[in-house]
Swiss-Prot record:
Gene name, Swiss-Prot/TrEMBL: pyrB
Transmembrane segment boundaries: none
Name of this protein: Aspartate carbamoyltransferase catalytic subunit
Gene Ontology molecular function: any one: amino acid binding
Organism of this sequence: Prochlorococcus marinus (strain MIT 9211)
NCBIfam families referenced in this protein's UniProt entry, alphabetically: asp_carb_tr, PRK00856.1
Length: 337
């Protein structure tokens, strides 16, 4: 395996093709472990991982816990509701508390964009060597979700020998509430970075026309994009036209908790225009896999019938793949230190 040069994982804007390949190859090895009878590895024995989620989570939090334990790390999960946050403590001071207790890595989720990066910079300024892994921040980024989505797609397209090259030239649709989705932003970096074209599909209120500018230039402070030839990003308002052109579709939850205005007429009309069902998919000759980062609003983004058909709706496969992907990220961040 080639070298790994990231001290933290805040987003995927600085990921190279080599980085994506490293993560997916390692995740593939970790995924195969149970077949060999091994449930745990001593790779991170004696290391301390603190999971600091200042926002509710089921899949991400639990899979990080399982991933850390399968690598034999010591794990402590922070509970915001019973912490000193209720007394006015800041997320930075909470993080510093865990660093003082010896945490080697902090996995951080927060409802405000930029919090994991701010904590990483503060720790570096203080001379701390603790790694920060972003578990999702505001509307900004959710790198581990995008990587497990990529891993799921690669395994679908090339199940016998998964390879990052299998995604190149594919057209992947992202449908739904893109405006409020940190997952969509991270998926844009990973999919276009690996050579896929992306079609963004949704109502104008949830998908502004200028969203395609998101990956047109590196973010502030990053002068060079490590990917020379990214895939294209397009916008569509028609689900039917989008699916006709797509090799796979990632549909997104309507994030009502982040909507501060009336952006939709009603949920019924949204489902009729942008909801995905078995009936809609039957109109196309090729098999189109359906992904969703969860949690799913049944009958809104995906029909119940389709959601329960795991031969084509890969939501449970995504959940399974979250563990080896997060094992890979923790290992890459910590094994060389």
């Amino acid at each position: 395996m080639a070298s790994w040069n990231h001290k933290h994982i805040i987003d995927l804007a600085a990921f190279s093709l080599e980085d994506y390949q490293n993560v997916l190859e390692l995740a593939n090895r970790f995924k195969a472990l149970p077949k060999s009878g091994a449930r745990k590895l001593p790779a991170l024995q004696g290391r301390f991982i603190a999971i600091l989620f200042f926002e509710p989570s089921t899949r991400t939090r639990t899979s990080f816990e399982i991933a850390a334990k399968r690598l034999s790390a010591d794990v402590q999960t922070f509970s915001a509701s019973t912490s000193s946050l209720t007394k006015g403590e800041t997320p930075l001071d909470t993080a510093l508390t865990y660093v003082a207790m010896g945490a080697d890595t902090l996995v951080i989720r927060h409802s405000s964009s930029g919090v994991p990066e701010q904590i990483a910079k503060s720790l570096e300024k203080a001379g701390k060597k603790t790694a920060i892994l972003n578990g999702g921040d505001g509307l900004h980024s959710h790198p581990s979700q995008a990587l497990l989505d990529l891993f799921t797609l690669v395994n679908f397209f090339e199940p016998s020998k998964p390879d990052i090259k299998s995604i190149k030239g594919k057209r992947i649709a992202i449908v739904g509430d893109i405006l409020h989705s940190r997952v969509a932003r991270s998926n844009l970096w990973s999919l276009t970075g690996c050579g896929a074209d992306v079609i963004l599909c949704g109502p104008k209120s949830l998908l502004p026309n200028d969203f395609v500018d998101f990956v047109s230039s590196p973010p502030p402070g990053q002068l060079i994009d490590p990917i020379k030839n990214r895939g294209k990003v397009m916008i569509s308002r028609s689900l039917k036209e989008t699916l006709q052109q797509s090799d796979a579709v990632i549909t997104l939850r309507l994030q009502k908790e982040r909507m501060n205005q009336n952006l939709l007429t009603n949920l019924g009309s949204y489902h009729r225009e942008y909801g995905i069902s078995r009936r809609i998919l039957q109109n196309f000759r090729k098999e189109i896999p359906v992904l969703h980062p969860g949690p799913v609003n049944r009958g809104i983004e995906i029909s119940s019938e389709l959601l329960d058909d795991q031969s084509i709706c890969l939501t449970q496969e995504q959940v399974k793949n979250g563990i080896p992907i997060r094992m890979a990220l923790l290992y890459l961040l910590m094994a060389s230190k």
